[in-house]
Amino acid sequence: MKKKSIKDKEQENNWEEKVVQVKRVTKVVKGGKKLSFRAILIVGNEKGEIGVGIGKASDVIGAVKKGVTDAKKHIINVPLTKSYSIPHPIEGISGAAKVILRPSAIGSGVIAGGSTRTVLELAGVKNILAKQLRSSNTLNNARAVLNALSQLRTFQNTAQNRDINIERLFNM
């Protein structure tokens, strides 16, 4: 079976891209200051696949393009429940940022702020409660959410890890 390239994956899924932040950054060099742009992008298909990427270039368009390719390289799968929530509460950490994610009732919507909200919406999560702690850094908060979502486990995963069937897992 042939390996799927990034272009094949791109055609299969309808990826939605959102630019979370574009910053003007400078680097001091011998001749003065060199100006460039840093773009933070989130790419998702609202079906449980999500990625966060960064792009740096001398112009904004180039930074966004690099950010999209970087985000598509770092895509993770998110297990969603039937109510488009997460299976269990979880915490994620990236740098100084800490994010707490909790499943919520049907119809409650995405209760989150900043880049956390964008990541969760593009992942396809529709009912969740999230809280950002310790840091307001956009990139670290987005990565903390990605860290938390990558740690999520379903009942099937837990049963396989323990080498028992799902019925026994519920009866414990």
UniProtKB/Swiss-Prot annotation:
A GO biological-process term: translation
Provide the alphabetized UniProt keywords. Answer: Chloroplast, Plastid, Ribonucleoprotein, Ribosomal protein, RNA-binding, rRNA-binding
Its function? With S4 and S12 plays an important role in translational accuracy.
Against HAMAP family, the record matches this protein to: Ribosomal_uS5_B
Give the quaternary structure: Part of the 30S ribosomal subunit. Contacts protein S4.
Q: What is this protein called?
A: Small ribosomal subunit protein uS5c
- Where in the cell? Plastid, Chloroplast
* NCBIfam families, per the entry: rpsE_bact (TIGR01021)
Which Gene Ontology MF annotations are present?
Answer: rRNA binding; structural constituent of ribosome
InterPro entries attached here? Answer: Ribosomal_Su5_D2-typ_SF, Ribosomal_uS5, Ribosomal_uS5_bac-type, Ribosomal_uS5_C, Ribosomal_uS5_N, Ribosomal_uS5_N_CS, Ribsml_uS5_D2-typ_fold_subgr
- Which Gene Ontology cellular-component terms appear in the entry? chloroplast; small ribosomal subunit
Stored Pfam families: Ribosomal_S5, Ribosomal_S5_C
Every copy of the S5 DRBM domain together lies at: 15-78
Q: How does the entry describe the domains?
A: The N-terminal domain interacts with the head of the 30S subunit; the C-terminal domain interacts with the body and contacts protein S4. The interaction surface between S4 and S5 is involved in control of translational fidelity.
